[in-house]
Amino acid sequence: MPQVTMRQMLEAGVHFGHQTRYWNPKMAPYIFGARGKIHIINLEKTVPLFNDAMNFLSSVAQKRGTVLFLGTKRSARESIKEEAERCNMPFMTQRWLGGTLTNFRTVKQSVARLKELEAAETDGTFDKLVKHEVLGLRREREKLDASLGGIKEMNRLPDAIFVIDIGHEDIAIKEAKKLGIPVIAVVDTNYDPALVDYAIPGNDDAIRAVQLYARAAADAVLEGKAAAPNSASVREEEFSAESADEGKGRRAPAKKGDKKADAAE
């Protein structure tokens, strides 16, 4: 598991919270104190929680699960997109569309439309249309790509969501909670850590801090993927199990009227 040290967190400014007047009392256990009316986050509490969260992400990836990277605030967009692409996971960096999770069937229809327009632009279909029609279709494609481009290969609901700012992404978190999707999130001093499954107390504004979180999350996913059994070994195990079952059937055929044997088969 890739480790992030306390020194790295200090250098990235993870320990700087929000102004003391904006604090959420439920963050009190993770606050070291205040400096110049700014809360200081206790990194001795953050590090183990951070490692727990990264271990969970790794375990999701090891089971071939999907992690949706989410960061639509300006300071998070670039890092979230870059790191999600590096570990080949879906992402959203523009405005969260209400119903992305809870109305996923409709979202998939919009994604299908995006793919249709992308294909039409490359297969020569656009060349057969008049200029104003092409412009209209390109605008539609650009709009869909901006909002859904990062999830166009996400064919089912994600197994977990990695979030940078829970206040900024509150609608997404509510949708995930409704569907029972685990949320791993950076929680600053002005929010309630109980709103998510894996809270990482830390600065959710500083670009360097966001880069650190996103890079570590991508590393955790990549490590989990590397530890996942490959398809060949999975098939070999299935074949061995099938052979064993067949052998058992030949050696000990069930007797008529033997309900236990019938159930075992």
UniProtKB/Swiss-Prot annotation:
Residues 245-265 have a biased composition (Basic and acidic residues). GO terms for cellular component: cytosolic small ribosomal subunit. Residues 226-265 are annotated as: Disordered. It comes from the Bacteria. GO terms for molecular function: structural constituent of ribosome. InterPro entries: Ribosomal_uS2 (IPR001865), Ribosomal_uS2_bac/mit/plastid (IPR005706), Ribosomal_uS2_CS (IPR018130), Ribosomal_uS2_flav_dom_sf (IPR023591). One of its GO terms (biological process) is translation. Keywords: Ribonucleoprotein, Ribosomal protein. Belongs to the universal ribosomal protein uS2 family. PANTHER family: 30S RIBOSOMAL PROTEIN S2 PROKARYOTIC AND ORGANELLAR (PTHR12534), SMALL RIBOSOMAL SUBUNIT PROTEIN US2M (PTHR12534:SF0). This is Small ribosomal subunit protein uS2. It comes from Xanthomonas euvesicatoria pv. vesicatoria (strain 85-10) (Xanthomonas campestris pv. vesicatoria). The gene is rpsB.
